[in-house]
Swiss-Prot record:
Protein name as annotated: Endolytic peptidoglycan transglycosylase RlpA
Record-level Gene Ontology MF annotations: lytic endotransglycosylase activity
Keywords, sorted A to Z: Cell wall biogenesis/degradation, Lyase
Species the sequence originates in: Rickettsia conorii (strain ATCC VR-613 / Malish 7)
Region (REP07 insert): 62-74
Length: 320
């Protein structure tokens, strides 16, 4: 364990194809590589930096023999997956300790600059906890579709797959005990569950991801659009009961929101739930051949779990 001004680090052996030597006591080959892990409790983030050791002895050698090669950020809850062989104490000379700390702060500062809006996943939840509302929903039940033009109450709607899309208007929610929607099929063959992070929209592709922000309180959540609606005047989106609770407008029933379509996150999400898009626009208009018969890429993480992970990536709440 390296301690520099209250910052704690773990030393972890990395595999080296050319030289697969392991720790023995406090010695290691000069070609061995290690991982430096920094935990920042104030932000809940964890960083790693690959460092190389020049010399044989870890303990008792001047600290200058350790140098940083590269760094990256990792989800804190992935730390148990790191193969930690042993933990060591490294003596740090006062002058070098200060330099190492400044270098680490500089490296980690650069790492954070480009990702200030997209923070790594939270460490507070396990896959089991994130999947508690649909633990057996490991195979997506619906299919991908954009859909044909349709008419409701004399108004024609034209579903499409935009490159970018934002919309501001009023949101309502559905899935209450008396409205009868819970458990019914959605427009793309999925099964509606009032406890999941889903929504209905008139024209966006199904399924896709949107960020919904409550203009009244700035609370936001990312939802999977898997149904059509709402068709009441001035309503632009219907969200599930759980989403309404997170956005804090369940009691009043409606609120003004901003919708942002997330095409890049949608593409990643479709891959994670093993749902392929139809090859042609014609098939996308009304496709049931795009249904997934494979479990999600992480068989411990349900479909709703994958939606929650994206929320955590953007540091958004997944519970009311």
């Amino acid at each position: 364990m390296i301690i520099v001004k209250n910052h704690k680090f773990k030393l972890d052996l990395l595999q080296n194809e050319a030289n697969k030597e392991k720790f023995e006591g406090n010695t290691a080959c000069s070609t061995a590589a290690y991982t430096l892990v920094r935990e920042d409790a104030s932000t809940g983030l964890t960083y790693t930096a690959d460092i190389s050791k020049v010399g044989n002895q870890i303990s008792g050698e001047p600290a200058q023999r350790i140098k940083i090669r590269e760094h990256r950020r990792i989800p804190k809850f992935d730390l148990p997956n790191l193969k930690v062989s042993k933990v060591y104490k490294l003596p740090l000379e006062a002058s070098y300790a200060k330099g190492l700390l400044l270098l680490l702060i500089f490296c980690f500062g650069l790492s954070g600059c480009n990702t200030s809006k997209r923070l790594p996943y939270s460490h507070k939840y396990s896959y089991k906890e994130l999947s508690k509302d649909d633990p057996h929903n490991l195979t997506y039940k619906g299919h991908y579709k954009v859909g044909k033009n349709y008419k409701i109450k004399g108004k024609t709607y034209k579903p499409h797959n935009p490159k970018s899309f934002t919309e501001t208007g009023y949101a309502s929610w559905y899935g209450g005990l008396k409205d009868g929607f819970h458990g019914k099929k959605t427009a793309n063959g999925d099964r509606f569950n009032r406890n999941l992070l889903t929504a209905a929209h008139k024209t966006l592709p199904l399924p896709c991801l949107v960020k919904v922000t409550n203009k009244a309180n700035n609370k936001a959540v990312i939802l999977m659009v898997n149904d059509r609606g709402p068709f009441k005047k001035n309503r632009i989106i219907d969200v599930s009961q759980r989403a309404a609770e997170i956005l804090a407008f369940k009691n009043q029933g409606i609120t003004k929101v901003k919708i942002e379509y997330l095409p890049n996150e949608t593409e990643k999400f479709l891959k994670n739930i093993n749902l392929k898009k139809p090859q042609s626009k014609t098939l996308a208009k009304n496709s049931k051949k795009s249904s997934s018969n494979k479990v999600t890429n992480n068989n411990k993480c349900s479909v709703n779990c994958h939606i929650k992970l994206i929320n955590l990536k953007y540091k958004l709440a997944v519970t009311p």
